[in-house]
Amino acid sequence: MNLTPAQERVYGFVRDYIQKNGYSPSYEEIRQNLGFRSLNAVFKHLKQLEQRGYVQSLWKNKKRALELLPLHTGAVSIPFLGVVAAGTPIEAVEIPESVEVPESFLANGNNFALRVKGDSMIEEGIREGDILIVARQSRAENGQTVVALVQGEATVKKFYQRGEEIELRPANSRMQPIHARADAVEVVGTVVGLLRNYRRRSLGVV
């Protein structure tokens, strides 16, 4: 079963923290590093991960009691197509590269990956340098996070359509949405997953 982007961020942080330190992060460390406003959000996502068989809590009411459970799905290589803006739209650069992702992260059909540039989606937990996993599709529902082309330039935003007008809304209260006619916006795909490398290993794209 696919995880939500927020669940993937929590799982990825816990996994990388355990690999680096040999023990699990505290709930407060998860909250601070992933930008959640409250511990309740952390508890909610961890409970969902536990229900789906990704983690388990060894001791109740302990700060560092998380254990990763073995995953029964392998890694899948998908195309890595360059950089997408989480700010002002920029052109996505196609390069001969690929990235391996957990099979459980993928949607049905054609998937690809893009690196985020900018911080307009920061309030959704999407940071500069993150790798987005995108399911290629030409339609989206209101409220979905999409990769879209606006006059040929790629951007990642929240999608809303009212009649013939499309609003691409940032998740950053300091930034303004993009408004355009429907015929000027091409939805490339919807964001179905996110990878974050805390060691900031380069994939060859600046």
Swiss-Prot record:
Could you tell me the EC number(s) of this protein? 3.4.21.88
| Molecular function GO labels | DNA binding; serine-type endopeptidase activity
Q: Which domain of life is it from?
A: Bacteria
Listed SUPFAM superfamilies: LexA/Signal peptidase, Winged helix' DNA-binding domain
Q: What class of enzyme is it?
A: hydrolase
**Nucleotide-binding as a keyword?**
no
Identify which residues the record assigns to the active site: 120, 157
**Entry keyword set:** Autocatalytic cleavage, DNA damage, DNA repair, DNA replication, DNA-binding, Hydrolase, Repressor, SOS response, Transcription, Transcription regulation
> What chemistry does it catalyse, as a reaction equation?
Hydrolysis of Ala-|-Gly bond in repressor LexA
- Give a yes or no for keyword Hydrolase in this entry: yes
The feature table lists the DNA-binding region at: 27-47
Functional summary from the UniProt entry: Represses a number of genes involved in the response to DNA damage (SOS response), including recA and lexA. In the presence of single-stranded DNA, RecA interacts with LexA causing an autocatalytic cleavage which disrupts the DNA-binding part of LexA, leading to derepression of the SOS regulon and eventually DNA repair.
Assembly, in brief, is: Homodimer.
Q: What is this protein's record name?
A: LexA repressor
* Gene name per UniProt: lexA
